Amino acid sequence: MSSAAKNFYQVVKSAPKGRFKGIKRDYTVEDVLKLRGSIDIDYTLATRGANKLWQLLHTEPFVPALGAQTGNQAVQMVRAGLKAIYLSGWQVAADANSAGDMYPDQSLYPANSGPELAKRINRSLRRADQIEACEAEDYLAQRDWYAPIVADAEAGFGGALNCFELMKAYIEAGAAGVHYEDQLGSEKKCGHMGGKVLIPTAQHIRHLNASRLAADVCGVPTIIVARTDAESSRLLTSDIDPRDHPYIDYEAGRTIEGFYRLKDSTAIQYCIDRAIQYAPYTDLIWMETSHPTIADAREFAEGVHKQYPDKMFAYNCSPSFNWKKHLSPSQMEKFQKELGAMGFKYQFITLAGYHANSYSMFDLARNYKEKGMLAYSGLQEGEFAAEKHGYTAVKHQREVGTGYFDAVSRAVTGGLSSTTALSGSTEEAQFQTAVASQDEEILSLTAQNVAGDEKILTPDALRFLHDLNTEFNPRRLRLLSKRNQVQADINNSLWFPDFNKETEVLRSDQGWKGAEIPRDLQDRRVEITGPTDRKMVINAMNSGANVFMADFEDSNSPTWRNQLEGQINLYDAVRNNISYTHPTTKKEYTLNEKHAVLKVRPRGWHLPEKHVLIHNQPTSGSLFDFGLFVFHNAKALIAQGSGPYFYLPKLQSAEEAQLWADVFKYTEDKLGLARGTIKCTVLIEHLLASFQLHEIIHALKDNIVGLNCGRWDYIFSYIKTFQNHRKFLLPDRFQIGMTAPFMRNYSLEVIKACHLRGIHAMGGMAAQIPIKHDQVANDKAFALVRADKEREATDGHDGTWVAHPGLVPLAKRVFDQMMPKPNQISKNLTRANCTKEDLTVIPEGTRTEAGFRHNISVTLGYLDSWLRGTGCVPLYNLMEDAATAEISRAQLWQWLHHDAKLEDGRTIDAGLVKQTIAAETERRLIRAGSVVNRIPEAADLLEKFVTEEKMSDFLTTDAYDRLVSEGY
């Protein structure tokens, strides 16, 4: 190199303009020229990567990266769309070092191990580029495979000379960036270990200066990252640098090794001061932290930016943190964006490769041990499904370059090779399409085994589920999309709920009927509902009620265990082979010879089953619950003189009812059942459905035997439907009974429609439970139940619902006295047809502090139990399920977003809501003591549901995502 070079841009010619702005060097251009040698050597990958990373840091909100432990992991990262790669010293120590041994992160491995891994990564990326280019018509890869690598140089493996040599080795390996930490190399520890010892500030500056010198000598604008471990290090080698003096605890004395002790109280400020000293010598600064805290990051960034406003930072999103413990899901979603806005431009997960490899292999091995080849087939199904996202490793021969070397072979032999490897391989024969044929494919399960599930999750049953979902799930999703559009039109005042003029002829035609009612369903005067746990199934069927509705929906928390154990319990109950022994009292529970008729409520159309995937997409919860039950039990029930009977929840339109009708027909044909064998009752629990009663019955006329007044969800739907319209503000929910005008009109309209069509009109739920410790309160509660059931029987309902076996005798007495026949379908109501105004009239009442607090308390209590796997919860002497929690949170949302006033004149605002949630959370936590609970998570969800801009459709969908993410 000529001595004519005057500045470092002439020495590092590839550096873009402004690259070294603010960078300080304690050496001269002449020093670089003297050390470079007489021949220029190009380091193409390192130079290209450094400039690319520099550009990304200045154009992206932040650059995310994962730690790669192998070359293939890096290939998959780039294929998935990541633009940078991290090389972790911890991962090198654990399983990627040149000694071939396993070490903790204490710089015990050979110093060349990191550069060797960088070489392997770049070679793998090069091969991926070559393979893709070889297959392309223009011989160019579709993407830039050479993602810049930021590599871990630990503490330099020694002094400044070691840092110099290590930087050169990383540049030769093609690294784009390198970071050095300010620990003592001989005592080096992982950033999340104890016993870390800092070196003096001046000594680390020499290390940074040495690494910059090495990059300049190589002519590469390598990104240098200075890491400080001052936040959690409590020891310092020497007090030679006066800049370290304010942070030394001289009173504590020195350690046995002679190290100085550091003050605990000044850790963040020490990081800031060290970062300010390092800033002129580095491109980015990294403060290693002991927990993910936005406040600490902001304090650090603002402290450095006071002196160096343009300095960028790196952030370790460490696997050593328990992320869920520190951050809520909503906080996690915005965590990296907030960091990026503060200047943390390079954000990485150090040990991603190690944990991804360890967990995925353990999970496969565990499942392989239990399921054999079904486990590996499940992995393949996941691979097939990922192909639509760009995944290609399912074709592993092609992935590693077999086709590429076939091209080499053909080139060598002039195109005459007869020994190419990919042609004729099993991969070519079996993996030409992303998935197996439909006849061969079943579906993939992502959850753990449940004891006894082998009799439920049989290959034939899974194939039936696959067929049901393939046939009907796309239509379900379209109908859900239509729901959203209808709601948007109401929100924007483009449409108001009304009767459909196009079906007026159908409504007025008195000549058609619903389905013929089976003998064992003629008398339904008392129906008991509840979840499908084993004890509940036995007690409910033995309760004296005519019908037991086994519930997979509102009174169920849809964990995988609950869904599978529920199916197992119903399978056994259908065969009169169910028993239960209480684990503490040892009391035995068995099924009586005479018991209730069984009906099953699957989940609503809106709920997915995320543990069962087809093409990596969730299946329908409705079809899962319905499909498994009908597949295993339909013929057994028919043989007993009964049949497969269902309750259908959450329908909003006749189109959704028609979907169920088509599912029934398909199922009957598929399972060899006579048309009309499947019977159903539809819950009218949405305001929009009340405008389509006749249309819903007509859609299901071959199967339907009744409608039911789902009162709690109906009130919730009223709030949700008119969520954007202030004039529909409701009073406290306990002021809205079935005698409220819009509720009474709806229930009478249900009776009128049902009896006209020859089917049952079922009354609503009595959620009260016996109050054993207070006879006066119990008598009062039972009096309310009695009055409600008398109203139902007088109006013409053919039966009613209760939630507790203790209410069965009371409800039965009322209907026995007032309905001597099995039903009163012959009782036709002659009242005038309802108008849209009748069905939407706004109830009068007040909003009280007690009602406001009760809504918060009920929703918190319910969500706490729901997240723990229990969907039916006794609260305040009522059996609460999802419906009552939905009313409560929806009212809170409505009141907050429309500035509703309490009767004492206070406006319900965000402050009052958050304050009350916090107070109720604290009260519940104190009361819970050491009992396992999910109250904090429940509070997070409740605050989200109440304060969000747009009301969520169902709280159970968001809460379900949390269950699935936690492996339940």
Swiss-Prot record:
From what superkingdom does this record's organism come?
A: Eukaryota
Pathway(s): Carbohydrate metabolism; glyoxylate cycle; (S)-malate from isocitrate: step 1/2; Carbohydrate metabolism; glyoxylate cycle; (S)-malate from isocitrate: step 2/2
Any one GO cellular component localisation term in the record? mitochondrion
* Expression (tissue specificity): Intestinal and body wall muscle cells.
This entry's Gene Ontology molecular function terms read: isocitrate lyase activity; malate synthase activity
- The protein in question is named Bifunctional glyoxylate cycle protein
Q: Which organism is it from?
A: Caenorhabditis elegans
Keyword Electron transport, does the record have it? Answer: no
Q: Which residues form a coiled coil?
A: none
Q: Which UniProt keywords apply?
A: Glyoxylate bypass, Lyase, Multifunctional enzyme, Transferase, Tricarboxylic acid cycle
Give the region (Malate synthase) as residue ranges: 444-968
Biological process per Gene Ontology, one example term: determination of adult lifespan
